[in-house]
UniProtKB/Swiss-Prot annotation:
<dbReference type="InterPro" id="IPR000392">
    <property type="entry name" value="NifH/frxC"/>
</dbReference>
<keyword id="KW-0547">Nucleotide-binding</keyword>
<dbReference type="InterPro" id="IPR030655">
    <property type="entry name" value="NifH/chlL_CS"/>
</dbReference>
<keyword id="KW-0004">4Fe-4S</keyword>
<dbReference type="InterPro" id="IPR027417">
    <property type="entry name" value="P-loop_NTPase"/>
</dbReference>
<feature type="binding site">
    <location>
        <position position="91"/>
    </location>
    <ligand>
        <name>[4Fe-4S] cluster</name>
    </ligand>
</feature>
<comment type="similarity">
    <text>Belongs to the NifH/BchL/ChlL family.</text>
</comment>
<dbReference type="InterPro" id="IPR005977">
    <property type="entry name" value="Nitrogenase_Fe_NifH"/>
</dbReference>
<dbReference type="GO" id="GO:0046872">
    <property type="term" value="F:metal ion binding"/>
</dbReference>
<dbReference type="GO" id="GO:0051539">
    <property type="term" value="F:4 iron, 4 sulfur cluster binding"/>
</dbReference>
<feature type="binding site">
    <location>
        <position position="126"/>
    </location>
    <ligand>
        <name>[4Fe-4S] cluster</name>
    </ligand>
</feature>
<dbReference type="GO" id="GO:0009399">
    <property type="term" value="P:nitrogen fixation"/>
</dbReference>
<comment type="function">
    <text>The key enzymatic reactions in nitrogen fixation are catalyzed by the nitrogenase complex, which has 2 components: the iron protein and the molybdenum-iron protein.</text>
</comment>
<keyword id="KW-0067">ATP-binding</keyword>
<protein>
    <recommendedName>
        <fullName>Nitrogenase iron protein 2</fullName>
        <ecNumber>1.18.6.1</ecNumber>
    </recommendedName>
</protein>
<keyword id="KW-0560">Oxidoreductase</keyword>
<feature type="modified residue" description="ADP-ribosylarginine; by dinitrogenase reductase ADP-ribosyltransferase">
    <location>
        <position position="94"/>
    </location>
</feature>
C-alpha cells in the first residue's frame, strides 16, 4: 500500500492536487482519500458535493459503520473527511485524531486499498495535523507551495515538523500562482531544505471551471494539458524512491534566500 501525505499552507491548492492525483490513480488503483483539513473540502470534486465529516457523523451516532464515514466518488475513489470544530471552538486538529482512530477501529486500513492520500493542513505541523506522520499512517510526505513568501515560509515550517517527526520527504510540488521565476524559486527552496522539486502545476482556468461543477480536471477535461500534468505528477510520486529527512532553513537563512530572488528579479 502506498501511503502519501500532502502538506501545505491553507489555500495553497493541496485539495485540488490531491483530488486530481486520486482521480488519476483511480484508473489503475484502488484509492482512499482522507481529508485532514477543517474546511472539509478535499473530496468535494471527487464525490460531487460536500461529504458529512467524521465528526458530524459521530455527533449523530457514536458507533457508525464504514458506510457512514466512507463514500465512493469518481473512479471508485473512497472518500473521507475528518472535519473540525466550529471556528473559535476547540482544537482544529481534533477531527484528524478522532477520524484516524475511528478508521483504524473499523478496519479501513486492512481493506483492499492500493493508495492512501492524506490532504493535511500544514500551517502548523503539530497536534492532530501531525497524526498521519506521528502515528505512522503515512510513509512519505510532499509539500505543496507557490513561490510566494508566506507559502514558502509555511513550507519551511512544515519541513521543520517533518524533521522533528523523522518523516520522509519525497519532494516539493510547486502549485504556480503566476509570479516571476516561480518554478526556479521553489526548485531552489527544495534544494535548500535537502529535497527536490518533484512537480510544477501551472495556473489554469480549467481548475476553476471544473471546481464550479464539483468535478476534477481529470474528469471534466480528461484530454487537456492540465489533466496530463496531474497524471504525470501522480505517476512521478507513485514511482518515487528518493526520500530525505529535510533540513529546514533558520529564520535568517530563509530571509536571505527569499531576498536573493527579489533582488535578482
Amino acid at each position: 500500500m502506498k501511503r502519501i501525505a500532502i502538506y501545505g499552507k491553507g489555500g495553497i491548492g493541496k485539495s485540488t492536487i490531491v483530488s486530481n492525483m486520486a482521480a488519476a490513480y483511480s484508473s489503475e488503483h484502488r484509492v482512499l482519500v482522507i481529508g485532514c483539513d477543517p474546511k472539509a473540502d478535499t473530496t468535494r470534486t471527487l464525490y460531487g458535493e460536500r461529504l458529512p465529516t467524521v465528526l458530524d457523523v459521530l455527533k449523530e451516532n457514536r458507533e457508525p459503520d464504514v458506510s457512514e464515514v466512507i463514500h465512493t466518488g469518481f473512479g471508485g475513489v473512497r472518500c473521507v473527511e475528518s472535519g473540525g470544530p466550529e471556528p473559535g471552538v476547540g482544537c482544529a486538529g481534533r477531527g484528524v485524531i478522532v477520524a484516524m482512530n475511528l478508521l483504524e477501529r473499523l478496519g479501513v486500513f486492512r481493506e483492499d486499498i492500493d493508495v492512501v492520500i492524506y490532504d493535511v493542513l500544514g500551517d502548523v505541523v503539530c497536534g492532530g495535523f501531525a497524526v498521519p506522520l506521528r502515528e505512522d499512517f503515512a510513509d512519505e510526505v510532499y509539500i505543496v507551495t507557490s513561490g510566494e513568501y508566506m507559502s514558502l515560509y509555511a513550507a519551511n515550517n512544515i519541513a521543520r515538523g517533518i524533521r522533528k517527526l523523522k518523516g520522509k520527504l519525497g519532494g516539493v510540488i510547486c502549485n504556480c500562482r503566476g509570479i516571476r521565476d516561480e518554478v526556479e524559486i521553489v526548485s531552489e527552496f527544495a534544494s535548500r531544505i535537502g529535497s527536490r522539486l518533484i512537480g510544477a502545476v501551472p495556473r489554469s482556468n480549467l481548475v476553476q471551471e471544473s471546481e464550479l461543477e464539483a468535478r476534477t480536471v481529470i474528469e471534466r477535461f480528461p484530454e487537456s494539458e492540465q489533466a496530463s500534468v496531474y497524471r504525470k505528477l501522480a505517476e512521478d510520486i507513485y514511482r518515487n524512491t528518493e526520500f530525505t529527512v529535510p533540513e529546514p532553513m533558520d529564520q535568517e537563512e530563509f530571509e536571505e534566500f527569499f531576498r536573493k530572488f527579489r533582488v535578482e528579479g
